[in-house]
Amino acid sequence: MLFLGSHVAMKKPHNFQGAIQTAISYGANALMVYSGAPQNTIRTKTEELKIKQALEIVQNNNLSLNNLVGHAPYIINLANPDETKRAFAIDFLSQELERFAAMKINKMVLHPGNYLKTNPQEGISLIAQSLDLIFEKTKHLKTQVALETMAGKGTEIGKNLEELQQIRTQVKNNTRVSFCLDTCHLFDAGYDLKENLEEIIQKIDSILGFQNISVIHINDSKNECNSHKDRHENIGFGKIGFETLLKIIYHRAFACIPKILETPYINDKAPYKREIEMIKAKAFNPELKKLF
């Protein structure tokens, strides 16, 4: 069965309840939310998120809790060599895991971090140490942190599969570490999904393990392979292309994994309902952007 959805915003006053209703209106059976704005750490109180109402809708629509995904804000950096800033990040992400657990979301996607003025290996060590502290603070939870593949902009860690696996290997309680594949990021980092898809999928298994992949972000790319740009494009309108993305979405190795669209809005309107329809029909609509 295909588990497909998109990022949906949690907006006041309906918050989580509204996000679930929006996802269902798109024809989705999976979704991803931030527990607040991705660009800051301001958060609405958990008791105001309308969690009970949201979970009733989930149950009434036969949605699986395993297909609900959380995402940490972009601005958190566990690789920051500044101890004060890193301590804040550790405390904040511990609170985020508590919030997602209250929402019955069992995985939180995280951009691993930026090593800034140090080096990749030091950054990897700091991320692993930080995750150890986070998992100790939240040892009563089972919520996973899904480390995301990155495009390799600047000093990003996670630009290759090996860096992500190194983090997981160094974490003591690594049963709570999984991975999120992002198609745009992989392509922009130099993994040519268009030309070498099966080879890359086998590499994902040998380095990360299929059993450790918990989320896949489905995005086309505005830029060429190995560009290190990280600019998402609508499905089929970028350099990866519809057919390649379809092969990934329907690949047997990823059958049970929720796929989440993070494609750009078109004229300030969410394209997800139309993109989900295209994917389910397995037919690209070159006129899609004209519909908005």
Curated annotation (Swiss-Prot):
Kindly name one Pfam family recorded for this protein. Answer: AP_endonuc_2
Question: Which residues are listed for Zn(2+) 1 binding in this entry?
Answer: 71, 111, 148
A single Gene Ontology MF term assigned here is: DNA binding
| Chain sites annotated for binding Zn(2+) 3 | 185, 230, 232
Residue numbers binding Zn(2+) 2: 148, 182, 217, 262
Q: Which reaction does it catalyse?
A: Endonucleolytic cleavage to 5'-phosphooligonucleotide end-products
InterPro entries, alphabetized: AP_endonuc_2, AP_endonuc_F2_Zn_BS, Xyl_isomerase-like_sf, Xyl_isomerase-like_TIM-brl
EC id: 3.1.21.2
Say which enzyme class the record assigns. Answer: hydrolase
**Keywords recorded for this protein, A-Z:** DNA damage, DNA repair, Endonuclease, Hydrolase, Metal-binding, Nuclease, Zinc
BP-aspect Gene Ontology terms? base-excision repair
Alphabetized SUPFAM superfamilies for the sequence: Xylose isomerase-like (SSF51658)
Known cofactor(s): Zn(2+)
Recorded hits in HAMAP family, A to Z, give: Nfo
**PANTHER family membership:** APURINIC-APYRIMIDINIC ENDONUCLEASE, ENDONUCLEASE IV ENDODEOXYRIBONUCLEASE IV
Q: Which family does it belong to?
A: Belongs to the AP endonuclease 2 family.
Q: What does this protein do?
A: Endonuclease IV plays a role in DNA repair. It cleaves phosphodiester bonds at apurinic or apyrimidinic (AP) sites, generating a 3'-hydroxyl group and a 5'-terminal sugar phosphate.
What's the name of the protein? Probable endonuclease 4
Organismal lineage: Bacteria, Bacillati, Mycoplasmatota, Mollicutes, Acholeplasmatales
Gene behind the chain: nfo
